[in-house]
């Protein structure tokens, strides 16, 4: 029997996490794929003809969730800052410049993603 790097339980949890962040793949140059016994791969920054510049392997759903959450949040902050004086700021600085309501709205999305993914 070939070695497995991810348990069946974690593989199912990772699949739910990947599905929860489906909207991210539509707006960002990211793809998350199930690599079977190896876990899940986040492929990022596709450049023809070489392919993806960055690949991260996940074998536990919690770290995958946190990584995709940060990616989603950073993308939202980038889009909010684009074309404004905040464009040159770092993500933390952009977040602090947002109205409290917008900050709460963004952070509530994390709760929604966690619920969809079955992460507690």
Question: Where in this protein do the model-derived segments appear?
Answer:
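Intrinsic disorder/low-complexity segments
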Residues: 19, 23, 36, 56, ...
